């Protein structure tokens, strides 16, 4: 029988319910801090408030408070929004913080216990630039052993072993750093052995997802157990996206709620809107790809939580799905994207 490994133990896939496949509830994103524009320096250095929130929304990575998604205030705000997520029909959250993002399993376990939402934690490595010397020196064999151990044996949290339920997010820049290639290859090798799900984070270049999949597939990983994240900020042309879809992995639109006139992490492109995300997903559905689509928010800064004026983890369910229904998407198609596809991806299938 297939199972899904949550931080509180294994469950059958049908118990997951509606699932967000790419979120964070506690991580350190300070590596991506950007100095504020001189004209707004004082506003972005100030504490986030109603009078500064407009500046933070425009320049989210220029507020140090905003990218510190691990302090007590952030954790309280995240818990409040997870409870709202549950209230509006959410069942499970896949927490994608990996080595380099300072994944906090203790917090994830506490949130699972206190909210009743299923949490699935990931193993894997973020980009090379965010690794310490010990992690950055690991070989493919050592990485494979580590990922296998985190999934099979688990990690000790307050005297109990907590098992990871997938490999991810495995992140890379472009051109892909040698260490990141090792991580992708290790993920492919272990996926083949364990039958677990894998989640990839590509750089903000159209070629990156194709190269990641080549390395992963060559290492033995199954395409139908791999998610390519952040495609709504990576491949903007639908025809190119359809070409990428031929590789057989999951197509994930996971930046719902991110609507900005200036995308700080890639200033050469315009971030698409939620309306455009819906339109693109509908085009993919019409091409027969509904069984390969996933949706999420990738919340990783405070200003996206409701306590800071944001949309919270329930945004897709309360604001996006009604718009999709109004445009002709069926209940069955939504259930496929939010319930069935996540369960199929997360289920261990050796």
Swiss-Prot record:
Highest taxon of the lineage: Eukaryota
Example GO BP: catabolic process
EC identifiers of the protein: 3.1.-.-
UniProt binding sites for a divalent metal cation 2: 169, 201, 230
Stored InterPro entries: AryldialkylPase_Zn-BS, Metal_Hydrolase, Phosphotriesterase
UniProt record similarity statement: Belongs to the metallo-dependent hydrolases superfamily. Phosphotriesterase family.
Protein name: Phosphotriesterase-related protein
Source organism of the structure: Drosophila ananassae (Fruit fly)
Lineage of origin: Eukaryota, Metazoa, Ecdysozoa, Arthropoda, Hexapoda
